[in-house]
Each structure stands twice: as C-alpha cells, then as structure tokens.
Amino acid sequence: MTPAKGRVFLIHWNPSEAEEHAQRLCEAGWQVEIEAEDGARAGNAIKADPPQVVVIYLSRLPSHGRETAHYLRSTIATRSIPIVFVDGKGEALEKTRAKVPDAIYTTSEKLNSVLQKFTRV
C-alpha cells in the first residue's frame, strides 16, 4: 500500500456529503479525518493532532466554517496550519475572505490540485 500523501482534516456541515468528499480525497492518496457537526470539536481535534491542511466547505453553513477557521487562526498551536475553503459563493465568500484572508479559496473540482502543494515529502 502506498503511504498517504499526508493528513487532511475535512470540515463540512453535511455528514453524507462530508463522507463523499473524504472518499474522493482518500482515493487520491490522502488520510482524511472528518468533522460534520461541531466546529469546537473540530478545533480541539486539530489542535491535539495537527494535519498538513484543513479543508472547510462553505457550501453549507458558511458562518460555522468561518468561525472554526477564525478559532484556528487565533490559537497559537493551530495558527500556521494551512486552511483551504471550498465552494464559497457570494456574500458568504466575501465575509470569509475578510475574516480569514490568508486562507486558500478553491472549488471542489480544483481541490486535488490545490492540495498537491501540501503533500508530505
């Protein structure tokens, strides 16, 4: 078995969609941990065992994803972990860019190529 490219922590507020997205990332060679219900739980898990990158979907409950990312940026232990926001649109995307300007923003279609820069060597 090929070693994983690295660990991704995926946050999506719809459990079945989170599983689908995680499956695609696993097929691309990533080890994936999911949180689909509780941003605070996600933040604590990320702080306890930091991944290479955090992926947050904005397609559902973008304010929850934005607040989780803000927590990660305001906590010393998680401040430097890259955050990738996926599928944001309109006002939700604008608010997120304003609150977390150093994050990467992409679409589901381009996520695998964006994640390549975080591959474990």
Question: Could you say what each language-model-derived stretch is?
Answer:
Residues 11-12, 35-36, 54:
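Conserved sequence signature across two-component system core domains
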Residues 55-74:
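Conserved phosphotransfer microenvironments
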Residues 63-67, 85-113:
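Alpha4 helix (beta4-alpha4-beta5 surface) of REC/receiver domains from two-component response regulators
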